[in-house]
């Protein structure tokens, strides 16, 4: 190409850098980067042309770790007398569309109850859709999460018990690439599932973590307005 177009001075090698989607992930990024550069260098040297500017499109690698989705488990149900299902408070189809569209798996961990006994479970979304799930058949070898219990929430600062129970929270991490873009925010989603609240977590100038609410959970009224039922 350089011989055909002498003005050509750059090459775009596209994407392809992997991102960590499981705890056993092991990938030598430096080795791969060195291989890319050395291969281009050797080809240029062999053909006696100058080294080009090298551009990449490592989208998932660049932004993937910047996103996470947190769900709470609404309850547990038994199916086929052997499958334990945890039902989450949202939908995988709407919040993690790649789990439904291409069977993508993500780094998943419980947020609390780490000290509880673990059991193999299947995760089901809130919709009636038969594809709204995250299980070993489709995404990973097996899903193990802490057992649910009846532990009440700790009393608030005023010491008055709430009587409510602490739910199990589970987090899906490294979701920063494509999930929000595909799902969108503020529109009408599958089965009228509202867009979840979005929280930004950052580090301030003193190195301390800070967070703020970027967007509230989508309200039923806003969805009705979009559909034209409310003026």
Q: How would you label these PLM feature ranges?
A:
Residues 18, 30, 53:
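Contiguous mid-protein beta-loop-alpha structural module that forms a pocket-lining wall or clamp
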Residues 1-9, 36-44:
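Structured alpha-helical segments in the cores of large, soluble enzyme domains
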Residues 21-22, 174:
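Conserved "cap/hinge" positions at secondary-structure junctions
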Residues 13, 32-33:
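N-terminal, helix-rich and Lys/Arg-enriched segments in bacterial and organellar proteins
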Residues 35, 41, 45, 49-231:
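Charged (often Lys/Glu-rich) extended helix/loop segments that serve as interaction or gating elements
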Residues 11-21, 56-61:
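Glycine-rich beta-strand-to-loop/alpha-helix junction loops that act as flexible
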Residues 23, 28:
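Conserved N-terminal phosphate-binding loop of PLP-dependent enzymes in the Aspartate aminotransferase
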């Amino acid at each position: 190409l350089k011989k055909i177009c002498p003005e050509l001075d750059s090459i775009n090698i596209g994407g392809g850098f992997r991102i960590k989607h499981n705890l056993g992930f092991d990938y030598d990024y430096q080795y791969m980067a060195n291989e890319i550069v050395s291969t281009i260098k050797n080809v240029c040297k062999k053909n006696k042309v100058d080294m080009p500017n090298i551009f990449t499109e490592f989208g998932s690698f660049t932004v993937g770790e910047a996103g996470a989705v947190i769900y709470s488990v609404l309850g547990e149900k038994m199916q086929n007398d052997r499958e334990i299902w945890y039902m989450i408070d949202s939908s995988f189809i709407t919040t993690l569309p790649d789990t439904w569209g291409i069977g993508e798996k993500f780094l998943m961990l419980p947020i609390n109850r780490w000290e509880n006994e673990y059991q193999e479970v299947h995760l089901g979304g809130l919709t009636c859709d038969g594809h709204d799930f995250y299980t070993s058949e489709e995404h990973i070898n097996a899903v193990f999460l802490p057992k649910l219990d009846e532990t009440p929430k700790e009393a608030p600062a005023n010491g008055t018990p709430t009587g409510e129970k602490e739910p199990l929270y589970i987090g899906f991490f490294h979701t920063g690439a494509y999930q929000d873009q595909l799902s969108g925010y503020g529109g009408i989603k599958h089965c009228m599932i509202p867009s979840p609240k979005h929280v930004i977590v950052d580090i301030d100038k003193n190195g301390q973590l800070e967070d703020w609410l970027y967007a509230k959970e989508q309200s039923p009224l806003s969805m009705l307005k979009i559909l034209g039922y409310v003026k």
